[in-house]
Amino acid sequence: MGSMYRASKTLKSSRQALSILFNSLNSNRQNPTCIGLYQAYGFSSDSRQSSKEPTIDLTKFPSEKIRNFSIIAHIDHGKSTLADRLMELTGTIKKGHGQPQYLDKLQVERERGITVKAQTATMFYENKVEDQEASGYLLNLIDTPGHVDFSYEVSRSLSACQGALLVVDAAQGVQAQTVANFYLAFEANLTIVPVINKIDQPTADPERVKAQLKSMFDLDTEDVLLVSAKTGLGLEHVLPAVIERIPPPPGISESPLRMLLFDSFFNEYKGVICYVSVVDGMLSKGDKVSFAASGQSYEVLDVGIMHPELTSTGMLLTGQVGYIVTGMRTTKEARIGDTIYRTKTTVEPLPGFKPVRHMVFSGVYPADGSDFEALGHAMEKLTCNDASVSVAKETSTALGMGFRCGFLGLLHMDVFHQRLEQEYGTQVISTIPTVPYTFEYSDGSKLQVQNPAALPSNPKYRVTASWEPTVIATIILPSEYVGAVINLCSDRRGQQLEYTFIDAQRVFLKYQLPLREIVVDFYDELKSITSGYASFDYEDAEYQASDLVKLDILLNGQAVDALATIVHKQKAYRVGKELVEKLKNYIERQMFEVMIQAAIGSKIIARDTISAMRKNVLAKCYGGDITRKKKLLEKQKEGKKRMKRVGSVDIPHEAFQQILKVS
């Protein structure tokens, strides 16, 4: 009884202690020291639902009090830092929040220092004008990626905006992605507000950059804002300029509901969360909505804004940007660019977007064949957050079951693999990246090939013509490196289209290049020969006729389908020799000899051999007849022949990784 009494007394005192702790936490939720404790016990200090604060009243912001704008720039010109400062200025996040680049939420974004996924934040701002009462505005900011591979992400984000801040580094000036993003915004009829950032740098030259903006884009230099997002210098002029220059969203509040779906992501608990821009009408929680592309109907379970986290508001009005939750379980039902409307109403669908065009294809296989199901689940979840990846199942005789994936570029592919590893713990093997080719055969049929292994080697189907995709590449660089860059482009089978001077120090080059020549190491090579000063961007162009051949890699006479690639005939020998050398360096020695060959059809163009490990079978023969030793050596030789005939060669994961780097 004594022990039971003590246990009961201890339990009672523990309950009292927990009750006091939680009461204290609830009464001090705004206290910074208590917020950490509150979160440690599994409560969210940012939960708008459980907070006693009144919900945000969006009816105070008619469309004329709304501005939707995006920040666009070349990579590393300070987009995300500027977004941080603007959110601090409006009180959306606290100053010194301890998380630089707040909108870069992915681990891969923080590690690489780049923006991969466009993010949205709603800000509330009191605009004070002289001799007038302060007026409240709702500002929707969209931070976009800067790398060429994610230009599709930028174009989607711009569709929800009426204006854009074009940010340019005061030291580096106009770069290739600055040009590309400017024309994306220009084609979308957005109002462009030029911003020169990093004016606090010792090498900053704002006047030179102003002249570049004038010569390249015909922008008025009087309209350029000079700021430093790092120190806050000049930031007080940015939001007033947004309000004055960028028009409010067009739209009719009395019209039937029409919303543009411009992005989506998957949440483990809520399902698919859709980012929408309300073009006409209004949406309330509980409404029934339909998706024009699929025809599916759903009930709106939650609706709100990003402030900067998901904040439920119960409604969205004309011109506003926010999110909706419908209980959807897969993003395949939420097609980007789709029109969402109220069920049982008839509306004119919105224009939407161009379909995504995949530039690079690669096979993705589990490092351990037994992990195929786990890899499938991981890829299904990840593609819910990255709808620009195409996935189809495929089988390889060397690697087993896997997936053929289409990506927007090599960085996109690299980021996808890194996210698979970091977010889902899966180890994968990637095959050589290829681009989609078109082949015509002797019987007149045409075939588009994304996987080299799918190209028939049957002599009956002789290839009579072939075409490869090309791109229009834009390169901006210092004039002293022009010769080296022209040589690089010529080596990559490029055709020069334009050569102009931006100013006395910088040159603008435009080339038509085969896509295959730039997907692997062109950007790295360009940065290397220009000491990192060149910038590069490209856009799709037409297919052009080319002399293409299928290059097979054979191990002991057996073709390995996962190592096959398609190359230009002029480069076949060099690529084959390089592949053979890399495989020799990374395949471990076996008990039998391994012959590595590169072949075009039946013609061997490169060969090397990995010698066998040799066991000393004569170790125990201390003298005796020489015929005994010869007999043992012959027996060993026959065994190695038999082993070579039936043995399999293990190709390590590192070998596949190195082969990816062969241009």
Curated annotation (Swiss-Prot):
Main location: mitochondrion
tr-type G domain boundaries: 64-250
GO molecular function: GTP binding; GTPase activity; ribosome binding
Enzyme class: hydrolase
Enzyme Commission number(s): 3.6.5.-
Record bears the keyword Transferase: no
Gene3D superfamilies from the UniProt entry: 3.30.70.240, Elongation factor 4, C-terminal domain, Elongation Factor G (Translational Gtpase), domain 3, P-loop containing nucleotide triphosphate hydrolases, Translation factors
Pfam families xref list: EFG_C, GTP_EFTU, GTP_EFTU_D2, LepA_C
Keywords of this entry: GTP-binding, Hydrolase, Membrane, Mitochondrion, Mitochondrion inner membrane, Nucleotide-binding, Protein biosynthesis
UniProt keyword Transcription, yes or no: no
GO-annotated biological processes: positive regulation of translation; translation
Residues annotated as binding GTP: 73-80, 143-147, 197-200
Record's subcellular location: Mitochondrion inner membrane
Catalysed reactions, as listed in the record: GTP + H2O = GDP + phosphate + H(+)
GO terms under cellular component: mitochondrial inner membrane; mitochondrial matrix
Membrane topology of the entry: Peripheral membrane protein
Family listed: Belongs to the TRAFAC class translation factor GTPase superfamily. Classic translation factor GTPase family. LepA subfamily.
Function: Promotes mitochondrial protein synthesis. May act as a fidelity factor of the translation reaction, by catalyzing a one-codon backward translocation of tRNAs on improperly translocated ribosomes. Binds to mitochondrial ribosomes in a GTP-dependent manner.
HAMAP family the UniProt entry points to: LepA
Additional facts recorded: This protein may be expected to contain an N-terminal transit peptide but none has been predicted.
Listed name of the protein: Translation factor GUF1 homolog, mitochondrial
Provenance organism: Arabidopsis thaliana (Mouse-ear cress)
